[in-house]
Amino acid sequence: FSVRESSQLADIHYTRQGDPLGLGHAILRAKSHVGEHSFAVLLGDDIIDARDPLLNRMLEIHQQTGDNVIALLEVPAEQISLYGCASVTATDSDSVIVTDLVEKPAPGTAPSNYAVIGRYVLRQEMFQILEQTAPGRGGEIQLTDALQYAAKHTGIAGGVRGVIFTGRRYDTGDKLDFIKATIKIASDREDIGPDLKEWLKEYTKSL
């Protein structure tokens, strides 16, 4: 692995959330660093393979439409209650118009199987909406609630578009998923993948 000085990669700032008051609250903590610009939110426990240019496509759609853009993944009905869920309308491009969102719907009540995953491109005006968003599910300030408001009041912070992702994604939200993601990513590497796969074959014989 090669290591480079972080100063050569980006201008890095950080802030502490303090109390776990929701994703919307965490994003508000970065307001002073964003200024008057649109910005991207990338959740660290949602890994997208760099060979699948999801964020680049989201940025293109944002630049073309001026809308907020979220990443969507079609999931089985029994899993949708684990995610924010989007109602969508098809367009003539590879993006969809998001008409409504609900945070972790109760089983059997989801409006679709499109789950919101951890990539967002947001307009600066979303900070203003988040500041006015009351605590929702779990007593937290939910980004999903703010995006729902934006989807229904497009004149305030632009509309909301979705990009339906079909590439390689790894959820590392718990210990087992983290281990699975590490093995999958490592086995796909050209330098160590072949040796790792051979070791895995031998190791699993003993299980």
Describe the function of each predicted region.
Residues S2-V88, Q124, L130-T133:
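Conserved beta-loop-beta/alpha segment of the NTase-like Rossmann-fold superfamily
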Residues F1-V3, V98-T99:
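Short, flexible segments with low predicted structural confidence
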Residues L196-W199, Y203-L207:
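Intrinsic disorder at enzyme termini
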